[in-house]
Curated annotation (Swiss-Prot):
Listed NCBIfam families: 16S_RimM
Functional description taken from the UniProt entry: An accessory protein needed during the final step in the assembly of 30S ribosomal subunit, possibly for assembly of the head region. Essential for efficient processing of 16S rRNA. May be needed both before and after RbfA during the maturation of 16S rRNA. It has affinity for free ribosomal 30S subunits but not for 70S ribosomes.
Subunit composition and interactions: Binds ribosomal protein uS19.
Pfam families recorded: PRC_RimM, RimM
Gene Ontology BP term (one): rRNA processing
Keyword vocabulary terms for this entry: Chaperone, Cytoplasm, Ribosome biogenesis, rRNA processing
Subcellular compartments: Cytoplasm
GO CC entries: cytoplasm; ribosome
Molecular function terms, GO-annotated: ribosome binding
Organism: Burkholderia ambifaria (strain MC40-6)
Protein name in UniProt: Ribosome maturation factor RimM
PRC barrel domain boundaries: 144-225
Amino acid sequence: MSGHDSGNAKRGRASFGAFVRKPVERDVVASAGEAAEQGSLEAVQAWPDDAVEVGAVVDAYGLKGWIKVATHADAGRGGDALLDARRWWLERGGERLSARILQSKTHGDTVVAHAAGVSDRDAALALRGFRVFVRREDFPELAADEFYWVDLIGLEVVNEQSVALGTVSGMIDNGVHSIMRVEYPAVGKDGQPTTDERLIPFVGVYVKTVDQAARRIVVDWEADY
């Protein structure tokens, strides 16, 4: 069993949905309205319920309006959502845009893409700092034993004796495999209610079943481990 996961969680980066958020360039050299005036982007109020943040625009690529996106997951490990989706959703501050993607491809550890109507480098530079979202329904299909992190967050975890172990609050990539962060209610040293955490490797030897419909994961793990 494997978690379809997100690249390295080192250097204190926090897991974000299915992915690991990477630092992005915040310098914005022009208003995105300049690009919108060219018919490339549509300002939107409505936002998809299943939108998942998958990257951020960090630079222009070339001279013909392509943008460069630092992805929160490598292509082949969740970042493929950017390559499959033909519609991206962009957000920066209070500004939200919808972009129709004409072409996209990997470039080193980034994804580069051309949005409809973004015709030159200046228009592409105007999009720097936008966070990029893709609808969950546009993610590539996975094998039966693979899961996106975003689909595991919030699932109940029980062991084979039906003892409740907690709820998946996040995922960690240790470079070898994924690890579930499972939160459960506890009592602190002061006698007050608190929340504690157990870490369970997301590998077949421990994870026996993942039932997304029932929102439950069954593991070979004891409460006192």
